[in-house]
């Protein structure tokens, strides 16, 4: 089943990269730092969010957490979440890469590799993780974009 992805673009949004195929979507975007999501939302996709520049206030299940550049954010399928600007953030914009993976793909992976328990991992370990500067090097993610393009192009 193919998911329809809806995005409300705001003035100042600059999409650096966008690719969607067969239940996997990669989005690299630069947005004004003062961008605030208006509503809590949820979706059936699992979300892996890397904040490359700037700061964000992330809300999971009505609890607020601060995320800064280099943080990896995991969002469970169906989890209520939202992102807001941080008051006093001197950065004019923030930059992030998000990988969305359809729930059906994770369920299929869990059947093929039951020892990994990917869905259960997201359910138990959602939240914000600090990575080292080496782990967040942009070049690694740009290389990953190329790898994902290759995988997406050769899935079928």
Task: Annotate the PLM regions.
Residues 1, 9, 65, 121-124, ...:
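Generic hydrophobic, helix-prone segments enriched in Leu/Val/Ile
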Residues 17, 29, 54, 94, ...:
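Intrinsically disordered, low-complexity sequence elements enriched in Ser/Thr/Gly/Pro
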Residues 1-22, 26-28:
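N-terminal low-complexity or simple alpha-helical regulatory segments
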Residues 23-123:
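N-terminal regulatory/effector-sensing and dimerization cores
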Residues 114-156:
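Amphipathic alpha-helical segments enriched in hydrophobic/aromatic residues interleaved with Lys/Arg
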Residues 7, 51, 106, 129-132:
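Compositionally biased amphipathic helical and low-complexity segments enriched in hydrophobic
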């Amino acid at each position: 089943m193919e998911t329809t992805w809806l995005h409300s673009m705001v003035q100042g949004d600059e999409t650096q990269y966008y690719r969607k195929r067969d239940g996997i979507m990669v989005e690299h975007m630069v947005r004004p730092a003062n961008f605030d999501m208006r509503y809590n939302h949820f979706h059936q996709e699992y979300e892996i969010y890397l904040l490359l520049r700037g700061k964000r206030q992330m809300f999971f299940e009505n609890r607020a957490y601060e995320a800064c550049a280099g943080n990896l954010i995991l969002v469970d399928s169906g989890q209520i979440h939202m992102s807001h600007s941080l008051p006093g953030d001197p950065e004019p914009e923030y930059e992030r890469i998000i990988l969305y993976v359809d729930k059906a793909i994770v369920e299929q992976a869990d059947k093929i590799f039951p020892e990994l328990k990917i869905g259960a991992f997201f359910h138990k370990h959602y939240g914000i993780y600090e990575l080292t500067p080496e782990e967040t090097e942009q070049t690694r993610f740009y290389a990953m974009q190329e790898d994902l393009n290759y995988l997406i192009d050769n899935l079928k």
